[in-house]
Amino acid sequence: MATPPLVPLLLLLLLLLPHAHHRLALRSVLATQRAQDSPAVHLINGLGQEPIQVLTFDLTRLVKASSSFELRTWDSEGVIFYGDTSPKDDWFMLGLRDGRPEIQMHNPWAQLTVGAGPRLDDGSWHQVHVKIRGDSVLLEVDGKEVLRLSQVSGTLHDKPQPVMKLAVGGLLFPPSSLRLPLVPALDGCLRRGSWLDPQAQISASAHASRRSCDVELQPGIFFPPGTHAEFSLQDIPQPQTEPWAFSLDLELKPSEGSGRLLALGTPEDPNWLSLHLQDQKVVLSSGMEPGLDLPLAWGLPLQLKLGVSTAVLSQGSKKQALGLPPSGLGPLLNLWAQPQGRLFLGALPGEDSSASFCLDGLWAQGQKLDMDKALNRSQDIWTHSCPSSPGNGTDTSH
């Protein structure tokens, strides 16, 4: 026998409730159903570190003091949600650090930073529930209580300011104002969000994400067409000195289009050494000199190794060596001695490029680079996930 739909069954049961509870229960059921039916949303809106949603609540009308949602991410650090009645004196933040949940609180009763629970950055959906009971805060992950903080809060009805703002996917003050700062942007998807009490909600504003959670995702770093990032050469592992050598390793997944993959240079002259994607090949060039190309084999690491007089591009058993002109070698080595030396990834600012590509990883001198620590980058870069097909990354539907 087919199982009856959840909402009609619950509505039927509501008819048996006393009239005094009828309207409250009906609103609760409908709010729960809306949360379950709503599609997953991406926690980064492409506008920087701003929240994807800000809700305002009247605490004097609050009946339900809990929030719940499901989260999927490969990102180990960022803000899930933040709430305050005063950004200076009374605020709360739930985020991830090293993949595990972290709560930060600052109010007249408690000032604390606590991490607890399992890692959530495994790419699976995890159910998270935050409850306020009297003066305590409870955190549940996948149905298990992982943290209970007692004597850390007054009741919500006793707050000096009766209005609370709740921000999803960001903060309402600078990250430096956190007790222990972290990178706010969290590359992840959230669904079935239920935030405090819908009956007490006064207003809501949203910034639609330009990323889709409907496409099949996998871990990695995704560069949509025209996006870029740059690292200062002084902030990444340094070349070997005797003899001089520097290497970059990329695990490149199937890509689309043509355009720049990476470059070494300065903001004024970024073309000292460049790698371009072109017709399923990579083309290595130095300055205005003719380049060489290497057909790509997906699934094998691509390595660029710089020596005293050559730049060697290799993948598996295939290898191409580009001789560096004597006049060009000195400036290339000097890149590491000046503060303007840069490693550029993706298109240069203002450069026309149709290339979209995903990196499974990027290593300098054998050490993995963290895109969250780039000197600057396009906000549309997916720092910890990739669509299974590069063409799906520009889908803005949810």
Swiss-Prot record:
Cellular location(s): Secreted
Predominant cellular place of this UniProt entry's protein: secreted
A Pfam family that the UniProt record links to this protein: Laminin_G_1
UniProt xrefs under Gene3D superfamilies: 2.60.120.200
One MF annotation (Gene Ontology) recorded for this entry: steroid binding
One Gene Ontology cellular component: extracellular region
Record has Repeat as a keyword: yes
Signal peptide bounds: 1-31
Disulfide bonds: 189-213, 358-386
Ranges for domain Laminin G-like: 41-213, 220-386
Glycosylation-annotated residues: 376, 392
Alphabetical UniProt keywords: Disulfide bond, Glycoprotein, Lipid-binding, Repeat, Secreted, Signal, Steroid-binding
Entry keyword annotation includes Amino-acid biosynthesis: no
Function: Functions as an androgen transport protein, but may also be involved in receptor mediated processes. Each dimer binds one molecule of steroid. Specific for 5-alpha-dihydrotestosterone, testosterone, and 17-beta-estradiol. Regulates the plasma metabolic clearance rate of steroid hormones by controlling their plasma concentration.
Assembly and interaction partners: Homodimer.
Name of the protein: Sex hormone-binding globulin
